[in-house]
């Protein structure tokens, strides 16, 4: 087994604000505030959660905004107020009608980003969990290298609130994300559930050779690193979690509906169990409604229970990832990968999961908060 110098990886990966860069819309410093390896508990990170993102308004982004299903009511003038070629700082308005985030940078969502001083300590000798008991929780599961919180794939809601069919945040919150594919929760903590093109640009992944292995995008609470989408050799890392075909005898249910759930979606040979009619999921031909009143097609892939792990896929090795959405190769040791398709659309489980590979002694180790500054409109 390759010995990994986690202290060296931490030292090289965090984006530290050494020039006191300030976001004028938050009146707060951006990215990591301080970072030090000399903590008795591990790698010590202090940050405020406000990234130094900037978005170049391209024609593609303008069309994306214009074609939002509720553009006529979401934007103050019925359309985005943007200029092609302009660089928009994180928080600078694009015309959204938002009662809470006054700048108009964010579509309607759970909350407005706040700047908060926060402190985390990551273990420098991560331990593999031999019994894989650490399920990915709601809320933070780690930290991206620019101080943005890393969240798992769930959105805290279930179909009809019956605690059976768990909704996936990247599906049901797809219209609640900003141009950097992030948003804030009700407490004001800005976070990503999946790949962020803005973080990729910040890490200068666009300029990396096609054959290069991705850089570290963040650190998971179990102490293992999360790398970007590329495995190397011009190839993406590939998730082996696959969507159920409800009409198939192998992965579906006898009636072709969401009437059964795998006993263990990590091992489909263990079969399924039928759910009572009250707990059946929607037909894959139905439409559902998000919290922001957008229509979400109920096709397979919008609930956690729509997925199963294909061990034969993972057994191929190389670019194919294990149950935890990670692998070990060359001199990297075990690491997770962000998963996307060729168009950089997020692919389940997006970051990690559904269980941590390593031992998590706390879901949010050594965390301290003090309110600094709420988003302000200048």
Question: PLM features: what roles do these ranges have?
Answer:
Residues 121, 191-193, 337:
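Residues within well-ordered beta-strands of beta-sheet-rich folds
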Residues 100-104, 167-179, 311-324:
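Short linear interaction motifs
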Residues 130, 198-203, 342-350:
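Short loop/beta submotifs within extracellular cysteine-rich repeat domains
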């Amino acid at each position: 087994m390759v010995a990994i110098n986690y202290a060296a990886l931490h030292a090289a990966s965090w984006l530290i604000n050494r020039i006191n860069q300030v976001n004028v819309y938050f009146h707060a410093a951006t990215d990591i505030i301080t970072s030090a390896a000399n903590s008795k508990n591990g790698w010590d990170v202090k940050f405020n959660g406000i990234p130094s993102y900037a978005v170049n308004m391209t024609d593609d982004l303008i069309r994306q905004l214009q074609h939002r299903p509720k553009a006529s009511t979401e934007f103050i003038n019925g359309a985005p107020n943007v200029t092609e070629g302009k660089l928009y700082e994180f928080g600078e308005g694009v015309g959204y009608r938002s009662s809470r985030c006054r700048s108009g940078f964010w579509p309607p969502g759970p909350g407005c980003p706040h700047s908060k001083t926060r402190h985390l300590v990551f273990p420098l000798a991560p331990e593999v969990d031999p019994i894989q008991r650490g399920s990915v929780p709601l809320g933070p599961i780690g930290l991206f290298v620019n101080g943005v919180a890393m969240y798992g794939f769930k959105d805290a809601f279930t179909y009809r609130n019956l605690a059976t069919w768990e909704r996936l945040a990247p599906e049901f919150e797809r219209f609640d994300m900003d141009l950097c594919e992030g948003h804030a929760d009700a407490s004001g903590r800005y976070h990503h559930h999946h790949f962020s093109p803005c973080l990729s640009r910040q890490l200068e992944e666009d300029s990396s050779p096609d054959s290069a292995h991705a850089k570290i995008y963040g650190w998971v609470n179990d102490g293992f690193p999360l790398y970007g989408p590329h495995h190397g050799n011009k190839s993406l890392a590939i998730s082996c979690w696959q969507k159920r075909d409800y009409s198939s005898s192998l992965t579906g249910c006898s009636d072709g509906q969401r009437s059964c759930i795998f006993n263990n979606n990590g091992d489909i040979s263990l079969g399924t169990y039928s759910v009572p009619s009250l707990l059946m999921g929607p037909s894959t031909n139905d439409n559902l409604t998000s919290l922001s009143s957008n229509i979400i097609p109920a096709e397979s892939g919008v609930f956690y229970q729509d997925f199963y792990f294909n061990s034969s896929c993972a057994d191929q090795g190389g670019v194919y990832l294990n149950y935890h959405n990670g692998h070990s190769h060359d001199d990297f040791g075990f690491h997770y990968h962000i998963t996307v398709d060729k168009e950089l659309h997020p692919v389940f489980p997006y970051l990690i999961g559904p269980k941590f590979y390593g031992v998590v002694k706390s879901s949010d180790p050594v965390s301290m908060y003090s309110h600094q500054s709420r988003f302000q409109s200048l």
